Amino acid sequence: VLTYRDGKLFKAVTRGNGEVGEVITPNAKTFVNVPLQIPYQGELILRGEAVITYADFEKINGEIEDVDARYKNPRNLCSGSVRQLNSQITAQRKVHFFAFALVRAEGVDFKNSREEQFIFLQKQGFETVEYKAVTADTMQEAVAWFEEKITDYPVPSDGLVLLLDDIAYGESLGRTAKFPRNAIAFKWADEQAETTLREVEWSASRTGLINPVAI
């Protein structure tokens, strides 16, 4: 969650448990595409996702000699990167931020439209998640389009969200114990691939354990 005041990045907080997160403002200032200053001068609060591209993940992991110390996936690497105590390390990880929800922007008329909120954020210099405006007739086509595109996406994505554009109507629906009723989330099916085990090598970890490594 990013908060801006007087056009400057004021605070950045992780999602945490949904109620309490960690303040990571110094680290957020090193994110590749987070604007430190924006045109809007009121208080702006937005939510987004921090990610590391697959290409940067492979490069960073390749520089770690200890096999056991390597990260399993870009999400694990990103999670550790945004919570680093040393902001210089965060900067080296090339973390990107994609906005997916505007929480507050006082005095701005969004014409009761979520899409207008996305357009506003883009004008402030933020990269937003990729989206398509759909109707009941075009929804399945759009889902299929994203499903095909996701295989070559440069950053991790675990699903797709259908969100009502009408802000007032969406908020009037309320929420369940865990989720708002104005949106539906889909998860992509797990990727599957067939592999061949050619041989097994043994590798010593930094703690002295001997571990098998599949080749």
What are these regions, as identified by a protein language model?
Residues V1-I215:
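RNA/tRNA-interacting regions in translation and RNA-turnover enzymes
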